[in-house]
């Protein structure tokens, strides 16, 4: 696969990931309100679960690396999940004096995202 085609695959996946992130974030606001960054937490957990499934599937040869890895791993998941928004959410919470909420958000994002990735990986091993 040439580099131009690879970039096209990544952009294709990224377009869907960005749209999914927006829709999930908006849905979280409607369902859960604006008092906590539920949207960022949700996309990071879901993205980590998908990454675990993807990597386990690639390792086992269930799916072929090209073009799945660049489309899903780099494009879709790169646009869906975000560390910069996670960081900004916590800075805003701390600036608002919501130190406990910021700590809870950090704990939940890190713990649940890693757990979801592990679960996704294990699901594909069985």
From Swiss-Prot:
One of its GO terms (cellular component) is plasma membrane. Na(+) is not transported, but it plays an essential structural role and its presence is essential for fluoride channel function. Its main location: membrane. It is a multi-pass membrane protein. Na(+) binds at residues 78, 81. InterPro entries: FluC (IPR003691). The chain crosses the membrane at residues 4-24, 35-55, 71-91, 104-124. One of its GO terms (molecular function) is metal ion binding. It catalyses: fluoride(in) = fluoride(out). Fluoride-specific ion channel. Important for reducing fluoride concentration in the cell, thus reducing its toxicity. Belongs to the fluoride channel Fluc/FEX (TC 1.A.43) family. This is Fluoride-specific ion channel FluC. It comes from Aliivibrio salmonicida (strain LFI1238) (Vibrio salmonicida (strain LFI1238)). The lineage of its organism: Bacteria, Pseudomonadati, Pseudomonadota, Gammaproteobacteria, Vibrionales. The gene is fluC.
